[in-house]
């Protein structure tokens, strides 16, 4: 039990002391500059200022002691060693191998995984080059202008986020990459109506090649090709697969030579580094994809070797533990001050909440501490005009991670100065607040003062990068992967399974049959009434 650890109980007592001192007091003291130096880190092209947190040097020391007692170093080493740390599925969780050098000593069950990984990477490079250069053609001999990635969850969120983040690197001449994930037919229909079937390529991305949403969309897209004149024997020019299930790929009609494999020791939310990232290589080129891997590898090396107190993923993870478990803060906000990173919060939602949204420990007993916070956010400055009111003055305190590139894009560089000014100002305002005395001195009407007071003392991290490059983006993603893993270790849960998504899938099958025909199943009264209402509407449609 995490709460049985000595450091956990020491942190409880320490919290009772620290909560009496607001951050404003620490920043008003003579050693404020030293505080910033002490509570900042640089790694893999990222700079972290975590001085605007409710911590002292003693807090940090106790948090690092908790990480030690919880077994973070040992579990980290077990992951890199390829041990079956995904205990409930009896698998390794070796996504770090996907971005490692060919001679890296990564093994699963005693066998090196590196030759297979780098063979797939070689094939991805060749394929991306052929498509992007126009050598790969559709059924009419024309080059590919549009690519549709069909997947869901980890087969969609990661590649979609990266393609959006690196869109400034895409060749304006194409190919353009589109993403379809939802089984709601509107998404696929609206995507396809803009495309030329003769010049479109579909990537069907599913580990098992049985995922309901993905296969429904893939079948509908195959029908779309056939309706628009692509012959059955030419479909192979318009489909490739990313999967572990060769037989299902062949049964669907995709040439097995156009299948890019990955492995069951890669979790979906950790898979963008594998052939699941084929859409990235097609969108921005394989060299950029390779740079993404290099950045992640740099963060892997930092995570594996840096002392805990200088280890960026560990420090960020333990700050999250501090707020979730000792300050009872149930949510956290990701605020990237970069439109390019606007999908990063959605990516983190899956990464953190699917990984650590668990209530059972590794030994099957209930967790005796709160686990994953609700993760939310949008790109700045949009968030300032939506939910920042609550973050500044609401009754719940929300820790915020700000992320910002320092160097402006070539277009409208003056806008970037305004963007950074707002980013830094929000973090300062959260920490500093505004007192009734300040407002009174400024001549504010007495009746308004209570409504304009900012308590301050609200925590945030600031993550900065020079430019949003593939290398730095890779490091940023890997940082949050490892942060998530470390928190799972402390909570003594398995961050690499997702059994919570299974029951809904099982129950959906008979309900689909009921909605489509006359079958009936036993349901609670509410669900039965919903099905009956839907059947009446469907019958009229």
Curated annotation (Swiss-Prot):
PANTHER family: GLUCOSE-6-PHOSPHATE ISOMERASE (PTHR11469:SF1). Catalyzes the reversible isomerization of glucose-6-phosphate to fructose-6-phosphate. GO terms for molecular function: carbohydrate derivative binding; glucose-6-phosphate isomerase activity; monosaccharide binding. The active site is at residues 354, 385, 505. It holds the Pfam family PGI. Keywords: Cytoplasm, Gluconeogenesis, Glycolysis, Isomerase. It comes from the Bacteria. PROSITE patterns: P_GLUCOSE_ISOMERASE_1, P_GLUCOSE_ISOMERASE_2, P_GLUCOSE_ISOMERASE_3. Its EC number is 5.3.1.9. HAMAP family: G6P_isomerase. Belongs to the GPI family. It is found in: Cytoplasm. It catalyses: alpha-D-glucose 6-phosphate = beta-D-fructose 6-phosphate. The gene is pgi. One of its GO terms (biological process) is glycolytic process. Its main location: cytoplasm. CDD domains: SIS_PGI_1, SIS_PGI_2. GO terms for cellular component: cytosol. This is Glucose-6-phosphate isomerase. Pathway: Carbohydrate biosynthesis; gluconeogenesis; Carbohydrate degradation; glycolysis; D-glyceraldehyde 3-phosphate and glycerone phosphate from D-glucose: step 2/4.
């Amino acid at each position: 039990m995490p709460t049985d650890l000595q450091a956990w109980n020491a942190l409880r007592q320490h919290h009772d002391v620290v909560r009496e001192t607001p951050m404003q007091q620490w920043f008003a003291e003579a050693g404020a500059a030293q505080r910033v130096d002490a509570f900042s880190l640089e790694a893999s092209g990222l700079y972290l200022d975590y001085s605007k947190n409710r911590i002292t040097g003693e807090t940090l020391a106790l948090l690092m002691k908790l990480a030690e007692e919880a077994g973070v170093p040992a579990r980290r080493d077990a992951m890199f060693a390829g041990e079956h740390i995904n205990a409930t599925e009896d698998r390794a969780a070796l996504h770090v191998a996907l971005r490692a050098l060919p001679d890296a000593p990564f093994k699963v069950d005693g066998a090196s995984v590196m030759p297979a990984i780098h063979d797939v990477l070689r094939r991805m490079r060749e394929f991306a080059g052929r498509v992007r250069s126009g050598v790969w053609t559709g059924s009419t001999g024309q080059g590919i202008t549009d690519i549709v990635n069909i997947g869901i969850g980890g087969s969609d969120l990661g590649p979609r986020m990266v393609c959006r983040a690196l869109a400034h690197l895409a060749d304006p001449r194409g190919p353009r990459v589109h993403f379809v994930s939802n089984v709601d037919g509107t998404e696929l229909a609206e995507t396809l109506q803009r495309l030329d079937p003769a010049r479109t390529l579909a990537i069907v991305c599913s580990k098992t090649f049985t995922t309901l949403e993905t296969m429904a969309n893939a079948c509908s897209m195959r029908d779309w090709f056939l309706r628009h004149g692509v012959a059955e024997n030419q479909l192979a020019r318009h489909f490739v697969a990313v999967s572990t299930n060769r037989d299902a790929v062949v049964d669907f009609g995709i040439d097995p030579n156009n299948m890019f494999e990955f492995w069951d020791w890669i979790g979906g939310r950790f898979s963008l580094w594998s052939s699941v990232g084929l859409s990235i290589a097609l969108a921005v080129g394989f060299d950029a994809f390779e740079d993404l891997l290099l950045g992640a590898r740099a963060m892997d090396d930092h995570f594996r070797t840096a002392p805990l107190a200088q280890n960026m993923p560990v420090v960020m993870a333990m700050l999250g533990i501090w707020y979730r478990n000792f300050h009872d803060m149930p949510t956290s906000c990701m605020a990237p001050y970069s439109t390019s990173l606007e999908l990063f919060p959605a990516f983190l939602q899956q990464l953190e909440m699917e990984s650590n949204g668990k209530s059972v420990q590794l030994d099957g007993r209930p967790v005796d501490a709160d686990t994953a916070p609700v993760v939310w956010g949008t790109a700045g400055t949009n968030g300032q005009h939506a939910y920042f009111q609550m973050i500044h003055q609401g009754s719940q305190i929300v820790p915020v991670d700000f992320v910002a590139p320092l160097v402006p894009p070539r277009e409208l560089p003056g806008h970037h100065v305004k963007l950074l000014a707002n980013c830094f100002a929000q973090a300062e305002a959260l920490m500093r607040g505004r007192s009734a005395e300040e407002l009174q001195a400024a001549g504010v009407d007495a009746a308004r003062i209570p409504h304009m007071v900012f308590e301050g003392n609200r925590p945030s991290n600031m993550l900065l990068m020079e430019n949003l490059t593939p290398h730095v983006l890779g490091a940023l993603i890997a940082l949050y992967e490892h942060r998530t893993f470390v928190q799972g270790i402390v909570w003594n849960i398995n961050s690499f399974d997702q059994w919570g998504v299974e029951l809904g899938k099982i129950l959906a099958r008979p309900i689909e049959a009921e909605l489509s025909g006359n079958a009936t199943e036993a349901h609670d009264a509410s669900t039965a009434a919903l099905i009956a209402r839907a059947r009446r509407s469907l019958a009229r449609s």
